[in-house]
Design a protein with these regions (language model features):
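Histidine/acidic-residue-rich, glycine-tolerant segments that coordinate divalent metal ions
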Residues: 77-81, 90-91, 103, 108-195
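Acidic/His- and Gly-rich active-site-bordering loop/insert found
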Residues: 1-85, 94-98, 102, 109-110
């Protein structure tokens, strides 16, 4: 799998989860970085398989601790260094769990199968690639995904469609320059990033 931390890091994360109250048996199932979860609701009526994807990774970002930062001010900032839900993943998980509750409550009114895919490692499509290779979407007829990222100007719901926001493109670039002392002789350098 792409982007999985080292065995030592995984062991530390797993122990931390147990120390913070996670069920040790569930944590064991996540060995090797397998943290994705798929919930499947099979109705009693035939029909298509519809899946909804909710990414749930955290980013390798240090969360701000100052009082002006709303999560710090209100007490819901990340407790762990370099592990921040900077792109709304906690919101995505909340939406997914709420959808699960609503779908289960309305199962008799539904047809076919519904899959709720809680996907790790959204950044760089690593998690999607691993889950696809594991066969999670092989039987899916329709797949919906979303991402928190726009600010509504009213209290109404905001839904957008786009060709670029929910996509990823990778580019390898190599920059070559000449280093120089920034204070003593900056004119001797060639900053390739400014070129």
């Amino acid at each position: 799998m792409m982007g999985v931390p080292s065995e030592a890091e995984l062991a530390d994360y797993m122990q931390r989860a147990i120390n913070e109250g996670a069920d040790p048996e569930l944590v064991k199932k996540m060995a090797g970085g397998k943290t994705g979860i798929v919930a499947t609701l099979k109705t009693d009526k035939p029909g298509k398989t519809v899946a909804f994807r909710f990414d749930m990774d955290c980013n390798d970002v240090e969360e701000e601790r100052c009082d002006e930062h709303r999560p710090a001010k209100e007490g819901f900032a990340s407790e762990h260094k370099k592990a921040m839900h900077a792109c709304g993943q906690d919101g995505h998980v909340t939406i997914g769990l709420s959808a699960a509750k609503l779908l289960a409550a309305n199962k008799a009114r539904l047809a076919g199968t519904v899959k709720l895919i809680f996907q790790p490692a959204e950044e760089g499509v690593r998690g999607a690639f691993a889950m696809m290779n594991a066969g999670v979407v092989d039987d899916v007829d329709y797949l919906f995904g979303g991402h928190i990222g726009f600010k509504a100007t009213t209290d109404n719901c905001l839904v957008t469609m786009t060709d670029g926001f929910l996509a990823t493109t990778k580019l390898d670039a190599e920059f070559t320059g000449v280093s120089a002392h920034a204070g003593a002789a900056p004119e001797q350098g060639k900053n390739a990033l400014l070129a």
